[in-house]
Amino acid sequence: MSGRRIKLRLSAALVAAGALVALAAWPAYLSGKTQLGSRAAAAVAVKPDWRVRDANIAFLESRAGRVRGDMLTPRMLATEYLQRYRERGDIGDVQRAERAARRSLAAQPRGNIAGEASLAGVLLTLHRFREAKAAVLRARAWRRDDAGLAAEEAALDLELGDVGGARRIIATFPEDTAFDVVAARLDEETGHLDDARARVARAMARADTIYDTPAERRAWLHARSGELALEAGDVAAAGRATGEALAIFPTHLRALTIAARVALANGDLPAAEAQAQRAVAIQPNPEVLGLLGDAQSARGETAAAAATRDVLLAVARIGDALHVNDRLIALWEADHGVRVDHAYGIARRDLAVRDDIYAEDALAWTAARSGRWAIARESIAKALRYGTHDPAILRHAAEITAHLDASDLSPAVIPRIRAMAAN
């Protein structure tokens, strides 16, 4: 399996990382209950909020610490830092956001709902999911009926592999638009891809009518729409959606990554290489480096592909002290037969952090590639237990079941696995 099939999963969070919790920080975006009519409202102009991000941060930094007991300024700083991370990919901004959020909570430990939500967004981005859920639960203790906070808890349940818990929370808020993105994630994991696409389309259309929606958030939704379209095999729709995302925010990392995958699916190698290069310039993570190397290799650019591979290996060897790229590194190493025992160890560590279907898939694939077939069989069965249609998981399942019998798998998934194996 090539690097292009590595998928950066964000839950509500995504994606990228921290998407749902981030969205919950924008009440106008998530908390409204008004449904779109039969005809979607016209999209409004994009707010160029990223242009004043540095100025906003500089101003807030100049005010921080001036007033004893100030909980508002550090909380606002945390929000701005985290948003700048999503726009530019500097993990240092996430660390700054954590310090700011904790200063806000130190100033007002009780009832600081926004401070807890900010901290949860940071911790989710850092893949410290259990700590993030604890912060959300503290916030919900003060505001139990808040749909945005409930959506955050459901998103974290999905990250932790608690599909039942997420489903129960979502059912408590039927038809609330605050849940469109996280419910779409649930639909995706449980094999209801058409429903997932419809929910994201509704969230996207709604966000596009609200001027105060951050440009990066709007682009993320269009990119997410493209990701789901690509997962469904609708390459044309995926291309349109990523084009829209990049028109909204031209340097959106997730949109560029998906655009590179779309170009590879279309056989447009120059475009795939160009989009991957743009993504690498923002954040050289294992996924985009893998895509770039694939495109370069396919174009016969041997020296460039070797250089990209060296960079990726350096990233994998140095590792990520914060472990936010663990799964990507494990999958890339397994795909390319590089340090497969190391990849398996990373996948085991990732599973201990969040036991969702993608963690089980990563463990299954790294186990298979390192010859641990019994573990591969057990883990791929867990990855498939909710009926996902994810092509990468099905491809892994096809290769694993080719070496083992499929008696542990649900009969419903066998035809999809066989179809994937035939292709």
Predicted regions and their residues:
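Residue-level recognition of tetratricopeptide repeat
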Residues: 79, 83-86, 121, 155, ...
